């Protein structure tokens, strides 16, 4: 599937910093694995049945920052992202709206691409739909059936295939959730704990046998379509190998989605751990209330840009909080971001001290390298801007250097 255009990323002089991120599994901040020719990064994409909202944007802007820090340090990044373009939420929305689910998915994918391009997000090298990856999913399911880590439910007319939670001895190492919490989230987040014939209520669907009216693909074990978790597992390992540096997404994906997608890969390839880092972003609320489709309080990126808000202001609004924190979005936050960027523009237009700018850029690098400490980064640039005296001449080398640094490291244009 086609991605979106690559933004221009300026080259910035200075010494890059070693990126360290909080790992959900190990529960600590540690250096990212960069000892391979390419740093593999897999980020879970959208299910394309609605526009890109601020919750989506906050996640993808976080991983854009990670990409930018790795690129700044001279690493080649192999960035892969999926699209869950065949799934129940898409079918349900298409049925509600009286449109073909393929047409709905295609239109929302186009809008997502546009939003990411407007936000200057670095595109994935491989932007992959679930429907494109059926052969890889089938191969993974076949392997799991053959090695006994998956089984066919025989209790009714539908021969669905499930992966056992006992497929790996380390299941649960990513989330560290209790059995009770796993059962709660499994039921709330697309699981089917009541399915008759499963060996364990937490066993995850990896192949849904064909039902009348649903899309399906032929497979040696019967026609059907992939389960949610195995799609990401197959796509990630096909493009990045059985072990790679970072798997990421929102904190609502920790369980069951990321726990199971890692477990499926580990059961297939015999790895003890699919990713070196499991990185998760906090949830975004609106004016003190959790942002959700059911509440109808989503803030869409396309709506903000159509109303005239600059994409860099959206980025600054998101970066005002730390990526791992659950945080709030508001009109006041966006207004403050606009005012902040304008102050930076004014400072860049008046800056004359190149050494001062170089020192500030180095501080930005080190703050970002320490688990993407964006609130401290914004405060550091504010401090620099407040020191700049006003004059009436054109932007000079110092201002151009600061503009390049903010563009390269934050994706913010001034």
Curated annotation (Swiss-Prot):
Domain of life: Bacteria
InterPro entries hit by this protein: Cys-tRNA/MSH_ligase, Mycothiol_ligase_MshC, Rossmann-like_a/b/a_fold, tRNA-synt_1_cat_dom
Positions of short motif 'HIGH' region: 46-56
UniProt: Zn(2+) binding residues: 44, 232, 257
Extent of motif 'ERGGDP' region: 188-193
Matches recorded under Pfam families: tRNA-synt_1e
Cofactor(s) needed: Zn(2+)
One GO cellular component term noted in the UniProt record for this chain: cytosol
GO biological processes: cysteinyl-tRNA aminoacylation; mycothiol biosynthetic process
Positions occupied by motif 'KMSKS' region: 290-294
Catalytic activity: 1D-myo-inositol 2-amino-2-deoxy-alpha-D-glucopyranoside + L-cysteine + ATP = 1D-myo-inositol 2-(L-cysteinylamino)-2-deoxy-alpha-D-glucopyranoside + AMP + diphosphate + H(+)
GO molecular function: ATP binding; cysteine-glucosaminylinositol ligase activity; cysteine-tRNA ligase activity; zinc ion binding
Keyword vocabulary terms for this entry: ATP-binding, Ligase, Metal-binding, Nucleotide-binding, Zinc
Entry note: cofactor: Binds 1 zinc ion per subunit.
Keyword Zinc in annotation: yes
Binding-site residues, L-cysteinyl-5'-AMP: 44-47, 59, 82-84, 228, 250-252, 284
UniProt-listed Enzyme Commission number(s): 6.3.1.13
Family: Belongs to the class-I aminoacyl-tRNA synthetase family. MshC subfamily.
Function: Catalyzes the ATP-dependent condensation of GlcN-Ins and L-cysteine to form L-Cys-GlcN-Ins.
HAMAP family named in the record: MshC
Subunit structure: Monomer.
Designated name of the protein: L-cysteine:1D-myo-inositol 2-amino-2-deoxy-alpha-D-glucopyranoside ligase
Organism: Corynebacterium diphtheriae (strain ATCC 700971 / NCTC 13129 / Biotype gravis)
Organism phylogeny: Bacteria, Bacillati, Actinomycetota, Actinomycetes, Mycobacteriales
